[in-house]
């Protein structure tokens, strides 16, 4: 019987991570294949009803958030994170206001829907903006430690 | 990467297995390091140096090719 134990060897840990990556790639291909099949046979609605769609979107969002850490590390500008935060917040408020406003137009005056949609867009945009701010702030602090 | 681990290990009378147990890795990893086929982390390099009573540069230092040519 194979004895299962915690891996302590750094080389095997790395190998293990590489194996997980391979499995993840295959799994994603499988999920995409199933979703593509659903799309062809049942149309877009049938595809999005599949719980695998939720899994796919969730992992895509998580991987996008995790890769933000890498994008921030790539930035080499000295600009302050506060300025970036203010600019992105201003743009976000403008965009969510526009979307909310556009939604109130239409056949009937639909103020509630406009507020809800604008609010959802605002919150969805706010989370990544705050996360990027936090990452930039962190890398800025680490940078200033060096000097 | 080339290194002097094998010589240092034999000098202190350790087998690959014994060294592996001392530093907490598998024998295969030690073997791959000796052959220069695995690039260990600095942490593992230090552990190995402590185990064979050598300094980092005695085991892992290699001169730059251009410096070698300049010396000759």
Residue spans of the language-model regions?
Chain B
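Short N-terminal alpha-helical targeting/association segments
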Residues: 1, 19-20, 26, 50
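Short linear/disordered segments characteristic of secreted peptide precursors
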Residues: 8, 40, 66-69
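DNA major-groove recognition helix of helix-turn-helix/homeodomain DNA-binding modules
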Residues: 24, 43-58
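Recognition helix of helix-turn-helix/homeodomain-like DNA-binding domains
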Residues: 25-38
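Short, charged recognition helix plus adjacent turn
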Residues: 60-72
């Amino acid at each position: 019987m194979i004895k299962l134990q915690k891996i302590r060897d750094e080389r095997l840990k790395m190998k293990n991570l590489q194996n997980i990556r391979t499995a993840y790639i295959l799994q994603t291909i499988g999920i995409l294949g199933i979703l593509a099949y659903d799309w062809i046979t049942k149309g877009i609605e049938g595809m999005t009803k599949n719980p695998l769609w939720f899994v796919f979107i969730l992992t895509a969002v998580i991987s996008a958030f995790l890769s933000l850490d890498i994008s921030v590390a790539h930035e080499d500008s000295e600009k302050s994170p506060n300025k970036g935060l203010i600019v992105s917040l201003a743009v976000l408020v403008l965009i969510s206001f526009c979307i909310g406003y556009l939604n109130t137009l239409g056949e009937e005056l639909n103020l509630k829907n406009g507020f809800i949609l604008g609010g959802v867009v605002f919150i969805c945009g706010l989370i990544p903006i705050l996360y990027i701010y936090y990452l930039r702030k962190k890398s800025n602090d680490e940078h200033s430690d060096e000097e | 990467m080339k290194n002097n681990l094998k010589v240092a290990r034999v000098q202190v009378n350790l087998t690959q297995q014994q060294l592996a147990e001392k530093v907490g890795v598998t024998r295969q990893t030690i073997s791959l390091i000796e052959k220069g086929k695995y690039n260990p982390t600095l942490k593992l390099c230090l552990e190995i140096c402590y185990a064979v009573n050598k300094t980092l540069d005695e085991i892992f230092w290699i001169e730059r090719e251009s410096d070698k040519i300049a010396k000759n």
